[in-house]
């Protein structure tokens, strides 16, 4: 089937922002102007289309990144039809995994900022993730109609806080109540939207006299930014003192895709102004799948290979999101990087080493769906009925294997015990938890061997609260949840140069004989676990060496101090012995486990606790109280910045163990006027008194 839309006219974009910058409203307006939605959805009355889980509509925050396809012909109807796939991303810090997951499959992003709040903590996290995946982006300053709105203040913050290189394409006409439209610096005309038509109609006019000086100054900066794209343009600019509209757009596009600049726009999504011009900027400056480099992967032998965004190439795709849908069951969202995927095809999953048959294919529009026959290179769609695919896995051509780079998912930092309320709930709970864990790789489920309890782990209190809530709503499971527990870790501080483990049972008949000598060394933070085989002269036969590694790995989940997982340790096997008849894999596994435990005891074992980066925005009157409170929680205050328009931002590093219930506490300290965000930073050694308490509590 021929393409309806050439690949050059595809845009895969994310709308990304801090929790209250108005991102969902912005996305809603995009859907409205692109003709998909005929009634505007508002987050605060719970009718927003993208926020399609019940809880999101109740809480007014976006949790899952729903993928939606929309079409756009330009605000003046002067473009051929473009196809825009929009991934809505959550703005709450507990859901950064969702942001990261969507960044991986996007080609470009619109970063939404509040004209009053500017660059907020989550904006910095999202910016870092976009840098990590090299995503070209543009900035949209929303809420220009709000009291305290200041476009140029946000411009300064983008430069200082994010080290961005924003290039305004428009500047606002007025602000707060008097915000009426924008000056388009490319066309050097004013754009005024018609309120009666909800912003679908607009007029170009002359630039207001009082803005001419400002407009000329910013136009000059815009043209200079364009001229810097090539020597040829720079010479043209120096000779003529100006550049025409086409030159400017081509040059800005080139520099945006290269990540050198970020076009910057503004408006108020709620009042239907400015989003239309932003959509034109998406088309003008953000890349199509054909503009980005081919995707990297490996063949079956681990050799690097690439696939281009071309229908004629062999099929490859990344499953980036799983969702349970009340009507069709399990949905797997895929981004097709190369080739074509048709319903009925059989594809290969190289991570599981299994074939999968593709059932129905759906193009999603927030919460309704259109069945399609095929998905072409560069497109995003949902597949129904995949049995064994987890988030972050590759699907590829059955005869031409490629393994795309896997996504990295952070380790959970908080755990809770969860118990079904009744026998009936017990059976359903297992299924519900495994389904949720499949959808969300930052959510883990395990069974505590000692207590027999089911332990769930995630990225924060809100994350777990929402998952327990989903269990109740979607799977009908009523459960009691225990107090949140911190995910401690154990490691060593010193080397243990030689430790022996011997597992011998020889009492007639077939015995057991395993003997190993290990050296243990601490690794730098984040080093995980490393095993080195340094056996000389076959004192431990080749076939038993994997068993030694496995024996140690099976010991890692439960350390010797308090039974927490062991991290950042390097184990070197350098000596041992064996018995011709009695040695076997199991004996070497046992010997390795014994040696490792003893080695840990001798190598100054310590308890590690998760440290959180906490950022509190508070009125100035309460800054001292907030800092004192953070210090009392063993926090290290790392700095304090002024918030433009009053107030302070306090940055601190605080152990997670001290942060439970902080939201309630902060509210009472500041009469509800402060807000905070918190994200995992790193693990650090717990002070002795804290470690002793934790170890004693685990020993009970």
From Swiss-Prot:
- Family according to the record: Belongs to the TRAFAC class translation factor GTPase superfamily. Classic translation factor GTPase family. EF-G/EF-2 subfamily.
Show the GO MF annotations. GTP binding; GTPase activity; guanosine tetraphosphate binding; translation elongation factor activity
Q: Name one GO cellular component term.
A: cytoplasm
Query: Gene3D superfamilies recorded for this chain?
Result: 3.30.230.10, 3.30.70.240, Elongation Factor G (Translational Gtpase), domain 3, P-loop containing nucleotide triphosphate hydrolases, Translation factors
Keyword Cytoplasm in the entry? The reply is yes
Role:
Catalyzes the GTP-dependent ribosomal translocation step during translation elongation. During this step, the ribosome changes from the pre-translocational (PRE) to the post-translocational (POST) state as the newly formed A-site-bound peptidyl-tRNA and P-site-bound deacylated tRNA move to the P and E sites, respectively. Catalyzes the coordinated movement of the two tRNA molecules, the mRNA and conformational changes in the ribosome.
Compartments, as annotated in UniProt: Cytoplasm
Q: Which domain of life is it from?
A: Bacteria
SUPFAM superfamilies listed in its UniProt record: EF-G C-terminal domain-like, P-loop containing nucleoside triphosphate hydrolases, Ribosomal protein S5 domain 2-like, Translation proteins
Name the Gene Ontology biological process terms. Answer: ribosome disassembly
**UniProt cross-references to NCBIfam families, sorted A to Z:** EF-G, PRK12740.1-5, small_GTP
Q: Where does GTP bind?
A: 17-24, 88-92, 142-145
Q: Record's InterPro entries?
A: EFG_II, EFG_III, EFG_III/V, EFG_IV, EFG_V, EFG_V-like, EFTu-like_2, G_TR_CS
* Main location per the UniProt record: cytoplasm
Q: What is this protein called?
A: Elongation factor G 1
Q: Pfam families per the record?
A: EFG_C, EFG_III, EFG_IV, GTP_EFTU, GTP_EFTU_D2
Report the residue ranges that make up the tr-type G domain in this protein.
Answer: 8-290
Keywords of the record, alphabetical order, are: Cytoplasm, Elongation factor, GTP-binding, Nucleotide-binding, Protein biosynthesis
């Amino acid at each position: 089937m021929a393409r309806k839309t050439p690949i050059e006219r595809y845009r895969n974009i994310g709308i990304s922002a801090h929790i209250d910058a108005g991102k969902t409203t912005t996305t809603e307006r995009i859907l409205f102007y692109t003709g998909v939605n005929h009634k505007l959805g508002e987050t605060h009355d719970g009718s927003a289309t993208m926020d399609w889980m019940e809880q999101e509509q109740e809480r007014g925050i976006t949790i899952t990144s729903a993928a939606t396809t929309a079409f756009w012909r330009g605000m003046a109807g002067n473009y051929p039809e473009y196809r825009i796939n929009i991934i809505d991303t959550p703005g709450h810090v507990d859901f950064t995994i969702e942001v990261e997951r969507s960044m991986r499959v996007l080609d470009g992003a619109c970063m939404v900022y509040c004209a009053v709040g500017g660059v907020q903590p989550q904006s910095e996290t999202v910016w870092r993730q976009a840098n990590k995946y090299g995503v070209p982006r543009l900035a949209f300053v929303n809420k220009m109609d709000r009291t305290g709105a200041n476009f140029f203040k946000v411009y300064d913050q983008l430069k200082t806080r994010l080290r961005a290189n924003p290039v305004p394409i428009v500047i606002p006409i007025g602000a707060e109540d008097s915000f009426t439209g924008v000056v388009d610096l490319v066309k050097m005309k004013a754009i005024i939207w018609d309120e009666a038509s909800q912003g679908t109609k607009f007029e170009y006019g002359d630039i207001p006299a009082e803005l001419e000086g400002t407009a000329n100054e910013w136009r000059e900066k815009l043209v200079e930014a364009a001229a810097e794209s090539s020597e040829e343009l720079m010479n043209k600019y120096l000779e003529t003192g100006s550049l025409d509209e086409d030159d400017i757009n081509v040059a800005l596009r080139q520099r945006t895709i290269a990540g050198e600049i970020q076009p910057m726009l503004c408006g108020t999504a709620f009042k239907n102004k400015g989003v239309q011009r932003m959509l034109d900027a998406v088309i003008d400056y953000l890349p199509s799948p054909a503009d980005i480099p081919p995707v990297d992967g490996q063949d079956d032998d681990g050799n690097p290979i690439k696939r281009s965004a071309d229908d004629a190439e062999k099929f490859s795709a990344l499953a980036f999101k799983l969702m349970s849908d009340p009507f069709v069951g399990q949905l797997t969202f895929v981004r097709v990087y190369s080739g074509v995927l048709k319903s009925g095809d059989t594809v290969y999953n190289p991570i599981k080493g299994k074939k999968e048959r593709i059932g129905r294919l759906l193009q999603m529009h927030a919460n309704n769906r259109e069945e399609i026959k095929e998905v072409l290179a560069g497109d995003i769609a949902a597949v129904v009925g995949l049995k064994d695919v987890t988030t972050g896995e590759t699907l590829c051509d059955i005869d031409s294997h490629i393994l795309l780079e896997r996504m990295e998912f952070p380790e959970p930092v908080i755990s809770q015990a969860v118990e079904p309320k009744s026998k009936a709930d017990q059976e359903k709970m297992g299924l519900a938890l495994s389904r949720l864990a499949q959808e969300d790789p930052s959510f883990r489920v395990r069974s505590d061997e000692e207590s027999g309890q089911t332990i769930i782990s995630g990225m924060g209190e809100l994350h777990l609260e929402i998952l327990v809530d989903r269990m109740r709503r979607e799977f009908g499971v009523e459960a009691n949840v225990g107090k949140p527990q911190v995910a401690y870790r154990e490691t060593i501080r010193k080397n243990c140069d030689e430790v022996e483990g011997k597992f011998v049972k020889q009492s007639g008949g077939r015995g057991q004989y395993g003997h190993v000598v290990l050296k243990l060394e601490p690794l730098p933070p984040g080093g995980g676990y490393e095993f080195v085989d340094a056996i000389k002269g076959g004192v431990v036969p080749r076939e038993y060496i994997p068993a030694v590694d496995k024996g140690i790995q099976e010991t890692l989940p439960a350390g010797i101090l308090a039974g927490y997982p062991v991290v950042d340790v390097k184990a070197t096997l350098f000596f041992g012995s064996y018995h011709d008849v009695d040695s076997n894999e199991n004996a070497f596994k046992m010997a390795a486990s014994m040696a490792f435990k003893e080695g840990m005891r001798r190598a100054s074992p310590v308890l590690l606790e998760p440290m959180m980066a906490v950022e509190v925005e508070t009125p100035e009157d309460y800054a001292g109280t907030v800092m004192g409170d953070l210090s009392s929680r063993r926090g290290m205050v790392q700095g304090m910045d002024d918030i433009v328009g009053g107030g302070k931002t306090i940055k601190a590093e605080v152990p997670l163990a001290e942060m439970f219930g902080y939201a309630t506490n902060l509210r009472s300290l500041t009469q509800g006027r402060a807000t905070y965000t918190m994200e995992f930073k790193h693990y650090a050694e717990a002070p002795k008194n804290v470690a002793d308490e934790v170890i004693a509590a685990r020993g009970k």
